[in-house]
Structures are given as structure tokens and as C-alpha cells.
Amino acid sequence: MIKINHISKSFGDKVILNNISGEFEKGKTNLIIGSSGTGKSVLLKCIVGLLQPDEGNVFFDFRNFTEADKEMKSEVRREIGMLFQGGALFDSKNVEQNVMFPLDILTKMPLNEKLDRVNFCLQRVGLENVNKKMPSEISGGMKKRVGIARAIVNNPNYLFCDEPNSGLDPQTSIVIDDLIQEITHEFNITTVVVTHDMNSVMGIGENILFLYKGKKLWEGTKDNIMNSGMKEFDDFVFTNKAMRNLRERAV
Amino acid sequence: MKEFGKYVMFLGSLFVRRETFATYYKLTLEECIQIGVKSASLVALVSFFMGAVTTVQTAYNMVSPLIPRFVISQVVREMTLLELAPTIIAVIYAGKVGSSMAGGLGTMRITEQIDALEVMGINSTSYLVLPKIVASVLMYPLLVILAGVCGLVGGYLVGTLTGAVTPTEFVYGLRYNYNPYVITFALTKSIVFAFLISSISSFKGYYTQGGALEVGISSTAAVTTSVIAVLLSDYFLAQLLL
């Protein structure tokens, strides 16, 4: 479980996050949603420690990550897997080396065990016979899968995904979403996904946190998304025609 | 001054939260091949022609019959070892290796590869930059030695083939009044230049923000700043050590 307490972050005079609190539950896909520029990615970066919040704390299973010393931060980070927007695969390494990288750095596993683990993770994300390919030789969707394989290779307790569907076709997006949800349930991980894709929200949104202009305006699940009673939230959700049709049918 | 302070802090961050020695050993070897071995042919070619041109021009300007011909190779020796090999090759090194370092790190920054390392709990400056600086400091003096040898060979071949100087005169000139301290000075300079080029280029690349355009700007800034730093340090080292 991850808990965020009163997180605020500004860049110069511009307030990006304003007093945001919330909880991300274990074994569920927790979504941070909102329009572009509302601070979703900044919040994610504050949670994983890529940015230091101006105020507030982040707790990973009751461990205060924000105020932790370097050793504890390092310990928590070893339990984190992250899928970046563009995959963030290392250009100079092939697929196998990319997935193996966290094991090389963070463990003392023998090579054959590492290879077994890498092959298991690649198979788990539906990739076979791509071990020796370079990132430039595979498609965007495959890069995302390799990114997921790398994120889960070290058995993380926490999985973070920054806009996992960006740049993907709708069909591949659904495959990636399903994969994230399956992995979350299968390995009982606390997963946090940043997205503004309503298909993802309706597909895998087990716990949803809605940001609007740097503030948390709404929290709920995909089941009570239709009756939030909040104009800003409805404006975001029902911009999509399919969502409007869905609401009309529900009414 | 703010930029300089940031640079000093960047250098300080290279030595905290380091990985295992084996990790650095492997990365440094890879960088040595990338930086040193792959630059050797260019350095050899450039220095060969620098030596050749220096010989031709020195011979052209020595018109007095009172000056012995072996002075040509003496001048070539001093120019090559003192300035051409360490300093001019440093400018070429900044253009080839420095821009490549800045471009590589800049691309890693904008594609979130550096963030990926940080999320894994790896000190990205130490992991990515320290091997580059160590490899540079190890390999650049070797490149300078190669440049010195190739420069003198170029001078010898062109000088003797054009008849500007006989082989015996050229070798005599090379050995005449030779001061071994010149080599110490050239190698000291090369270590300082290697450190400056690799650290400044890495610094510029590491802090790239934006997109592909900014990566190009970082690469250009890396080369220009490195070359200015090299030339300034060249002057101060000459004042200090000669």
C-alpha cells in the first residue's frame, strides 16, 4: 500500500500540486487521471522520488520515503518497478540485457538464473524470440512490453506506469492495460498508472484519483464514475463520445 | 558562477552511492574502447598530416644558409610534442568524443533512460559519467603519445621524400638538445585536458532539457565550452609548469 499525505510541489511561482492526499491499494490498479498539464506525471515523480515534494510525505507500506535516509530510499527503490512513457529502454543494450539490467545491478544471482528469470518475464508479457533484438528494431507496443518485463523482473512490490498507452493503437493499448492488470493481480503488486485514456479508466480503473489544476477533486472506482456529480470531472470523462453514449444508456 | 557551482556539485555527485568495482571495471573498459580505440585512426591521420605540414612550412621559412637543416626537425619535435599533439588533438577529441558524450547523455535524459536508472536506485551520474571520465583520463594520454609519434613520422617522411632534409639530419635534429621534461609536460596537459573535456561534455549532456533540438544544442555547447576550457588551462599550465 502506498499513502501520500498533503503533497505539494511548485516550480518557481507555478503551483503544480496543491495538498494532495490519497491511498493506493495493494493488489489493485490505482489510476491517477486528469487532463494534460494537471500534474499527474509530477505527482508520480514525487511518489517514486524523482522529484522532491515541497511539502508532504509518501509512505510505502508505512515507511516514510520522503524523509528516509539514503539507505532506506535505496531499499524501497529496489522494490519499485516503473514503466516509462516511451519505454525508456537502454539504446545500447538488447532486449535481454535491458530486462536483465535490474538483476545485474541489484542482485548477485548467477547468470543462468538471471536468464531463466528474463525469459519468464518476456514470456509473461507475450514476447518470444526477441531477446537479441535492439530497442530500435522493435515496435512501440513491444517496447512497452519489454519495459513491463524490466519493471517486474526483480519481483517489485510497487509498479508505476506513466501513460502506458501513449503512442499505441487502441488494440495494443487494451493488451497493455490488460497485461498491467493481470500482473498486478497475479503478483499482488501495488500498481499506480498515470493516464488520460478513458478506455484505460473504464477497463482497469479499480481505484481512481482525479486531478484538476493540481488538486485532487475526486476519488472512486470505475463503477461510480457515472454519478460523480462534479462538473470538472464530468467534463473530463464525458468529452469522449463513447462515454457520453454509455451515460445516456445508463440513464 | 551558478553554472560553475552546479558543475562542481555534479563532480561531487560522481563519488556518492557508487556501484560495485566490477560494474565500473566493465563500463570503463567499454568506454576505453569507445573513446580510445575508436579515436586512434582519426588521431593518427590528423597528427601525421600536422607533422608533415609543420615540416614543409618550417623548411619553407628557413631560407638562411646559416641555419642548419636539422633545425627543421628540432622545430617539428618541439611543436608536435609541446603543442600540436596535446592541444590540437584535444580540440579534435572534444569535437569527436565530447560531442558524442553530450549527445548520448542528452538523449538518455530526454528519453527518460536516466530517470529509469534513478528509479532503480542507481546513482546515474556515477554510473554513467564516472567511467567516461576515468576512461578519458586513461586513454587520452595514450592518444597524445600516438599523435606525437605519428606527427614525427609524418614530418620525417615528408621532409625526406621532398628533399627538405636528409634522414640523418632529421634524426639528428630530433635528438639534438632534447629535454625529456617536454614529455612529462605534454602528458600532464593531456590528463588535465581529458578530464576537462569528458567532465564538461558529460555535464552539458546530463542536464539537457527538452527534445532533439536541445540535444544538438548541448552537444555544441559541450564542444565550445570544452575547447575554451582546454585553451585556458593550456595557458595556465604553460605558465605554471614551464
What kind of region is each of these model predictions?
Chain A
Residues 56-65:
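Conserved ABC transporter NBD signature motif
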Residues 111-129:
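Conserved ABC ATPase "signature" region
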Residues 134-138, 142:
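Conserved ABC ATPase signature
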Residues 153-157:
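A short, proline-enriched helix->beta-strand linker immediately N-terminal to the Walker B motif
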Residues 170-172:
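Helix N-cap at the start of a conserved alpha-helix in ABC-type nucleotide-binding domains
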